Swiss-Prot record:
Major location category of this protein: membrane
Organism for this UniProt entry: Geobacter sulfurreducens (strain ATCC 51573 / DSM 12127 / PCA)
GO biological process: carbohydrate metabolic process; cell division; cell wall organization; lipid glycosylation; peptidoglycan biosynthetic process; regulation of cell shape
Location(s) in or outside the cell: Cell inner membrane
EC number annotated for this UniProt entry: 2.4.1.227
GO cellular component: plasma membrane
CDD domains: GT28_MurG
Membrane topology: Peripheral membrane protein
GO-annotated molecular function: UDP-N-acetyl-D-glucosamine:N-acetylmuramoyl-L-alanyl-D-glutamyl-meso-2,6-diaminopimelyl-D-alanyl-D-alanine-diphosphoundecaprenol 4-beta-N-acetylglucosaminlytransferase activity; undecaprenyldiphospho-muramoylpentapeptide beta-N-acetylglucosaminyltransferase activity
Protein name from the UniProt record: UDP-N-acetylglucosamine--N-acetylmuramyl-(pentapeptide) pyrophosphoryl-undecaprenol N-acetylglucosamine transferase
HAMAP family in the cross-refs: MurG (MF_00033)
The entry's keywords: Cell cycle, Cell division, Cell inner membrane, Cell membrane, Cell shape, Cell wall biogenesis/degradation, Glycosyltransferase, Membrane, Peptidoglycan synthesis, Transferase
Length: 364
């Protein structure tokens, strides 16, 4: 069988697609996968290094822009649609999966015109504009969080979770088997691959209020390149034991090590921390489209599987107080971590591939 995966732009869209591709290829050595994205998206940098085939088309957003920009976006959509039809005719996929991002729309619309089975996967609590539009032409809609179900037709929507790449799943399993080797309280702070400037600043402001816990607090803080020197200086000035890095190579090891995590609330982060069963203080990125990170975090909060501080209420003292309270309440930390792990769907990629393959058999 052949699977075409369309979309990307960001890691939050692309990496679930890679996880599905891994599962699909593992089913049969004869299976083939082709990605369709854009030259500007993260897929153009990541996929060539992984060995996956990638075809790039022209695509752009049209939402919330002026009339001229919308006209240009529509022209690019039509051009991308024509490119997608050509790719579909040449690759002749049995299945097409849209994972969100600009390239999804023209590709799935072209697949509809050619009567190829179509599926979409939504990673966030509030669906993106592209997936809301494509829901009308999709044969099945896979969702990561229950909250997004209301945006889609009930009879076509299936809760699968957010697929994690095999590398992450294997690292998590390996990390769980390792002993940590000390009795300190380990705090992990990170903001995605580029870091999160506001979290970096606020953590520095929180340090004076955490001085009483300095003796047993061990911190790993991933800052991104821009704030690395300033954050390192802040920890040194306050006398804290901290491993401050621009980028973390093995997130699974970092998760294993942590008793508590301070982080953003992107869909991939949620999938990974729940897979590891780790309690988190989520600080949602306030400028995410439709404020979806806040809704992602609230999805865990209402299930007792995480804590949330919104940026409008964030300060050094507020963050320090939250950390102190949780350091002093190990039973609560354990309960929240267990609740998070109950929400994990380690079989998300399997569930999606199962459903796509089963759908084609029904048509036969």
């Amino acid at each position: 069988m052949k699977l075409l995966i369309a979309g990307g732009g960001t890691g939050g869209h692309l990496f679930p697609g890679i996880a599905v591709a891994e599962e699909f290829l593992a089913r049969d050595k004869q299976n083939e996968v082709l990605f369709v994205g854009t030259w500007k998206g993260i897929e153009a940098r990541v996929l060539p290094k992984t060995g996956y085939r990638l075809e790039c088309i022209t695509a752009a957003g049209i939402r919330g822009k002026g009339s001229l920009a919308r006209a240009k976006g529509l022209a690019k959509f039509l051009y991308g649609y024509a490119q997608s039809r050509k790719i579909l005719k040449e690759f002749r996929p049995d299945l097409v999966l849209g994972v969100g991002g600009y390239a999804s729309a023209p590709t799935l619309m072209a697949a509809r015109g050619m009567q190829i089975p179509r599926f979409i996967h939504e990673q966030n609590a509030i669906p993106g504009f592209t997936n809301r539009m494509l829901a009308k032409v999709a044969d099945k809609i896979f969702i990561s969080l229950e909250e997004s179900r209301t945006y889609f037709p009930e009879d076509k929507t299936l809760l699968t979770g957010n697929p994690l790449r095999r590398q992450i799943l294997e690292q998590v399993a390996l990390a769980e088997s390792r002993e940590r080797g000390d009795d300190a309280f380990h705090l992990l702070v990170f903001g995605g691959s580029a870091g999160a400037h506001r979290i970096n600043l606020t953590m520095g402001e929180a340090l004076p209020s955490l001085k009483e816990a300095k003796g047993r607090l061990r911190i790993t803080h991933q800052t991104g390149e821009n704030d690395l020197e300033d954050v390192t200086a802040a920890y040194e000035e306050q006398g804290f034991t901290a491993d401050v890095v621009a980028f973390i190579d093995s997130m699974a090891d970092a998760y294993r090590w942590a008793d508590l995590i301070v982080c953003r609330a992107g869909a991939t982060t949620l999938a990974e921390v729940t897979a590891c069963g780790k309690p988190c203080i989520f600080i949602p990125y306030p400028h995410a489209v439709d404020d979806h990170q806040r809704r992602n975090a609230e999805s865990l909060l209402k299930r007792g599987a995480g804590f949330v501080i919104i940026e409008q209420e964030l300060s050094g003292e507020v963050l320090a107080q939250a950390i102190r309270d949780l350091m002093d309440d190990p039973a609560r930390l354990k309960a929240v971590g267990e609740a998070a792990q109950e929400l994990a769907r380690l079989d998300a990629a399997q569930a999606i591939v199962d459903e796509m393959v089963a759908s084609t058999r029904k048509e036969e």
